[in-house]
Regions:
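Non-catalytic terminal and connector segments of soluble metabolic enzymes
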Residues: 4-6, 23, 48-50, 55-58, ...
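Small-residue helix-packing motif on alpha-helices
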Residues: 28, 38, 55, 71, ...
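Rossmann-like NAD(P)(H) cofactor-binding subdomain of soluble oxidoreductases
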Residues: 15, 35-39, 44, 50-125
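Internal alpha-helical scaffold of NAD(P)-dependent oxidoreductase catalytic cores
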Residues: 98-108, 124-160, 172-210, 255
Length: 258
């Protein structure tokens, strides 16, 4: 497939890298007003351009990774030169209905929420679409399944998916940073503490994904009566570990909804 990404910021570039590294037979073009920061993508075979219309007529999927205020300007630029395209939008707050109205009935709107782990083939990309666009949306699902997982969700949960899957990357990194800081306090240099903390989180996630079980069941395997693990867990909960994370996620969602 030919994939055209408009918006070569962190997210757009991450998607391009992921497609280049983890999928086969796909040609990628990325556009950005200033391409200096994404020229390195050319080393992966990605075409880089300042022109949003460059190669767009050959595109099977057009991905929008731009700011909400840029949508109308970008669409006014590209719509006159394209026909019957699948347009996948990662624009926060832009509903499928709104996008479909903007692009017209000859195009198919799909809503996506990837994250920057796309470049490592480890994104959780939530996807929503109208039933009438199911066939076109399947192309998008197949593409993003190559960059991690691509669960199909109800569009009403897309704002929540933004927080859980996209903002969630930052929340997970904040936990790793805190674990690293604790590692330094108990004797490790920061590099070793970071390596141990990151690998431990990766291992925990792999166990969950492979065994498809509840986290508490895996926690039970690690904890022993009167052991150090349960003592640490209880101390963290005493100071609001779980509740503070839940509050943070809910606060982020409120920010999106205004």
């Amino acid at each position: 497939m030919n994939v055209h990404i408009i918006g070569g910021g962190n997210l757009g570039a991450s998607i391009a890298i992921g497609i280049a590294k983890f999928t086969e037979g796909n040609q990628v073009t990325v556009t950005r007003r200033n391409t200096k920061s994404i020229l390195h993508l050319e080393q992966l075979g990605v075409t880089v351009s300042t022109d949003n219309k460059h190669n767009i007529q050959e595109a099977d999927i057009i991905i929008l990774t731009i700011k909400p205020y840029q949508v109308d300007t970008v669409l006014a630029e590209i719509l006159p030169v394209i026909a019957n395209k699948t347009i996948a939008s990662a624009v926060s707050g832009l509903s499928i209905e709104n996008l479909q109205n903007k692009i017209g009935a000859t195009h198919q709107a799909v809503r996506i929420m990837p994250n920057i782990a796309s470049q490592f083939g480890a994104s959780a990309t939530c996807i929503a679409f109208q039933e009438s666009n199911k066939e076109a949306a399947q192309k998008v699902v197949t593409l993003f399944e190559g960059l991690g997982t691509a669960p199909i969700i109800d569009e009403k949960l897309m704002d929540a998916a933004t927080v859980l899957a996209a903002s969630g990357t930052a929340f997970a990194l904040r936990y790793i940073r805190a674990s690293m800081q604790a590692g330094i306090e108990i004797g490790f240099d920061w590099q070793t503490a970071l390596a141990i903390s990151a690998q431990t989180v990766k291992g925990a996630a792999e166990m969950l994904l492979e065994e498809k079980t509840h986290p508490e069941q895996l926690i039970d395997r690690v904890t022993t009566p009167q052991g150090c693990t349960i003592a640490g867990l209880n101390e963290m909960e005493l100071h609001g570990f779980s509740s503070s994370l839940i509050r943070g996620i809910k606060t982020s969602l409120k920010q999106i909804k205004g």
